[in-house]
């Protein structure tokens, strides 16, 4: 699995066990990602921070 990094032109291969791509952004600025990469379990979103996870690189 390859997930995009914070710089959109680059991607990285996920290590074993981390089989989800994720994107984290502030709810106030949904167009500006704060973090993106590979993760094992999708974190819960909060009032300030939202996570988008999926098993391809399309979501992040």
Curated annotation (Swiss-Prot):
GO biological process, one term: killing of cells of another organism
GO MF entries: toxin activity
UniProt xrefs under InterPro entries: Cytotoxin_Cobra, Snake_3FTx, Snake_toxin-like_sf, Snake_toxin_con_site, Toxin_cobra-type
CDD domains attached to this UniProt entry: TFP_snake_toxin (cd00206)
Cellular location(s): Secreted; Target cell membrane
Cellular component terms per the entry's GO annotation: extracellular region; membrane; other organism cell membrane
SS bonds (residue pairs): 3-21, 14-38, 42-53, 54-59
Keywords: Cardiotoxin, Cytolysis, Disulfide bond, Membrane, Secreted, Target cell membrane, Target membrane, Toxin
Superkingdom in the source lineage: Eukaryota
Annotated tissue distribution: Expressed by the venom gland.
Subunit structure: Monomer in solution; Homodimer and oligomer in the presence of negatively charged lipids forming a pore with a size ranging between 20 and 30 Angstroms.
Described function: Shows cytolytic activity on many different cells by forming pore in lipid membranes. In vivo, increases heart rate or kills the animal by cardiac arrest. In addition, it binds to heparin with high affinity, interacts with Kv channel-interacting protein 1 (KCNIP1) in a calcium-independent manner, and binds to integrin alpha-V/beta-3 (ITGAV/ITGB3) with moderate affinity.
Family (UniProt): Belongs to the three-finger toxin family. Short-chain subfamily. Type IA cytotoxin sub-subfamily.
Protein name: Cytotoxin SP15a
Organism lineage: Eukaryota, Metazoa, Chordata, Craniata, Vertebrata
């Amino acid at each position: 699995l390859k997930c995009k990094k914070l710089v959109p032109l680059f991607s990285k291969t996920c290590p074993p066990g981390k089989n989800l791509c994720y994107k984290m952004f502030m709810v106030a600025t949904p167009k500006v990602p704060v973090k993106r990469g590979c993760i094992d379990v999708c974190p819960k979103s909060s009032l300030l921070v939202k996570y988008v996870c999926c098993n391809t690189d399309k979501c992040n």
